[in-house]
Amino acid sequence: MKEEETTYHVPVLLKESVDAMNISPDGTYVDVTFGGGGHSREILSRLGDGGRLLGFDQDEDAERNIVNDPHFTFVRSNFRYLHNFLRYHDIGEVDAILADLGVSSHHFDDSERGFSFRFDGKLDMRMNKRAGITAADVVNTYEEERLADIFYLYGELKNSRKLASVIVKARTGQKIETIGEFLEIIKPLFGREREKKELAKIFQALRIEVNQEMEALKEMLMAATEALKPGGRLVVITYHSLEDRMVKNIMKTGNVEGKTTQDFFGNLQTPFRLVNNKVIVPDEDEITRNPRSRSAKLRIAEKK
């Protein structure tokens, strides 16, 4: 494993996820979350002369990890545009699509990116540094009710309305620009025993809103459903309940809402067959080596 790969992000469930893709040497594959390139390198190691891999990442920092391989094409884009770029590269159907939905260690460990409450720095949280609103924009400009909804829906925080009220009151005196300033405002709401867990939920909610993660995931999953050929695999690693619910729904019902449809005879209509009825999780050895993998869940579905 290359040094830049391990410092940028340690690939989670590497063997399990790539095995699940059922790689054929001459197949066409997509890694929609390239990141440190760990999964992509493993996929490429299994391809032959006719094989092809597209790797997506919207973060310009990921470009430092680009694989020098004639079978690999890097796409600097949000994976929500999967359909567009498959057409652009003249790819009809693909054999498997892999998505590791975890935030790269690089993002959490880079204080300038603003993803972690462990460091002071700007309230940013953008995956794509060239576009979109920042976390500071959210906490300084959103109406109180909208802020509360974000914390409730994306962070599953029970005190979301109190949290939003405190933030709105604080920003009337001075704009909230740094993580340190933000923590001073919200930390008094939590006891020491709950502090880390609650802060993690708050930062997750802001990150999801800033990057429109749920909307992007929905669009990618729908595009993946269309792009896979019969027998093709959708392989997804999730880390929190919101994204896991969406992935589980599309694999079971063919839509992210989980609405079931039946044919004339009452049989469930779905584009997928579940490969693993029980989620695959990291073993104790992997969690020891990479504690950030502890919440990972691997789901696999095969296109009918």
Curated annotation (Swiss-Prot):
A Gene Ontology cellular-component term: cytoplasm
First-level EC class: transferase
The enzyme's E.C. designation: 2.1.1.199
Keyword field: Cytoplasm, Methyltransferase, rRNA processing, S-adenosyl-L-methionine, Transferase
Main location per the UniProt record: cytoplasm
InterPro entries given in the database record: RsmH, SAM-dep_MeTrfase_MraW_recog, SAM-dependent_MTases_sf
Organism domain of life: Bacteria
Residue positions binding S-adenosyl-L-methionine: 37-39, 57, 79, 100, 107
Catalytic activity: cytidine(1402) in 16S rRNA + S-adenosyl-L-methionine = N(4)-methylcytidine(1402) in 16S rRNA + S-adenosyl-L-homocysteine + H(+)
Gene Ontology molecular-function annotations: rRNA (cytosine-N4-)-methyltransferase activity
Annotated compartments: Cytoplasm
Any one biological process term the GO annotation gives: rRNA base methylation
Function recorded in the entry: Specifically methylates the N4 position of cytidine in position 1402 (C1402) of 16S rRNA.
Family named by the database record: Belongs to the methyltransferase superfamily. RsmH family.
NCBIfam families per record: 16S rRNA (cytosine(1402)-N(4))-methyltransferase RsmH (TIGR00006)
Protein name: Ribosomal RNA small subunit methyltransferase H
Organism: Bacteroides fragilis (strain ATCC 25285 / DSM 2151 / CCUG 4856 / JCM 11019 / LMG 10263 / NCTC 9343 / Onslow / VPI 2553 / EN-2)
Gene: rsmH
